[in-house]
Amino acid sequence: MRVVFFGTPEFAVPSFRALVGEGFDVAGVVTQPDKPQGRSRSRFEPPPVKLAAQAEGIPVFQPNRPTGAAFYRQIGELAPDVGVVAAYGHILKPELLAIPRRGMVNVHPSLLPALRGAAPVEWAILNGLETSGVTIMQMEEGLDSGPILHQIPERIPPDVTGGELSSYLAEIGAQALVEALALIEQGAIASKPQDHARATYAPKLTRELARIDWTKDAAALARTIRGLDPKPGAWTELQGREVKLFGATASDGQGAPGEVLTTEGRLLIAAGSGAVAVEEVQPAGKGRISAADWIRGRGVKAGQRLS
């Protein structure tokens, strides 16, 4: 089966490698342009999928947007049987979806119709779900609304971070993708329409959403901090200076929301109900450090308030 692969971040790499490893004919890879890095923006970092494709000698396409007659012609010339999309980062137009002979499938890290949208991994943790998984979906014009081809449910490990769950589901997604494509190739797969009435959504993570609201209960705050680790990072302010928090667990404690309860041996901060113990922090413009090092460096004291 001849495949054209659309993907960008680390999440997509296991699916790409599974296709190559299982002998699928990956004719081309479409990924986002290299991103400028550093203060001068003069250094460019290639997407992880680009590096993986180059290592296999597979042609790479990096349009600013996957639209236009010239781009559609390039994809058509690859003569794909199927298109595979895994965290590519752009919505694909019907003209593109129609090019592969058997359409396009998407590797989506949730059990659709739950958590349609851009950030299903993080929202699964933020919402306190106990189970998530991966769906292989036939793509159509709507937002993650196409028929379900294959699903693998997985229990969400306790205290997992967004980054850890993403890596875990990326491997599950690669397995699900290979299984689904094998069934498609055999003509043995049956699609199932989604129940749109049961759909929930996982919108893009905004800076404001990542700001910690200390009036919430400790369990919800710990989920927020874990779910947004490593990116974008849940943040708060101490004396007007931004700091991101990581490695949070709900704990006992009482005080005004955002109040530092103790700095002895650990950083414990009062929530609307209970308290949150924090292991690591990241001051603005710096790397992650232990909470203990930050406490010593900033002179953080019990009674101060985070906001």
How would you name each of these model-derived features?
Residues 1-40:
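N-terminal Rossmann-like dinucleotide-binding module
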Residues 2-4, 25-29, 56-78, 83, ...:
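Internal alpha/beta domain cores that form substrate/cofactor-binding pockets in large enzymes
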Residues 7, 29, 53, 83, ...:
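A residue-level signal for conserved active-site and pocket-lining positions in enzyme catalytic cores
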Residues 13, 46, 68-72, 118:
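Structural motif corresponding to alpha-helix initiation and N-cap regions
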Residues 22-25, 82-201, 208:
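Donor/substrate-binding cores of folate-linked one-carbon enzymes
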Residues 27, 146-149, 246, 279:
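A short, local hydrophobic-aromatic micro-motif
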Residues 35-54:
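N-terminal beta-loop-helix "entrance" segment that forms/cooperates
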Residues 209, 215-307:
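An anion-binding loop in the catalytic cleft
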